[in-house]
Amino acid sequence: WYRTWVRWEKAQEHEKGAMQKIYRGTMHTQDPYDSKGLKEVGEIPQAEYTYAYLNTAYPCLNEKQLAIGETTFSGPDTLVNPEGMFMIEELERIVLQRCDNARDAIRLIDELTKEYGYGDGGECITIADPNEVWCLEIMGEGKKKKGAIWAAQRVPDGEVSVSANIPRIKYLN
């Protein structure tokens, strides 16, 4: 089961040198203060300022109108790295705290997964800001391999993209 609560997390200033904890199990909490079942898997340097965002099972919107939608497409089990720090919901949370546009969100996902690893299955996230929409598909590189295999494609103006639990990006340059 996924958590059913929603909470608006306030913008915050953080001390220089602070660290931000990364967890597994966040989608299965019963309320915003429930820490049963959470597993701390690591820490990353905290940003000095984080934006307010809507915290749901898959965090989805911040105060800068950066929005993220998620759909799972699984991917091969052989590409899942259980030691990768980030699951998709934690990547979404960090992106919404730190980014104000879709392109920066994609860059941050690339940086975080290269540095700390991606431990989830195949996911497609739609990342939108007031000016453009991108589809990013991501999966692990394999057991014991830090990083992620990902591709992103901009949705052209005037077009619609639908991702219903299947990969949508067909061609890469």
Feature-to-residue mapping (PLM):
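A contiguous strand-loop segment
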Residues: 1-87, 108-173
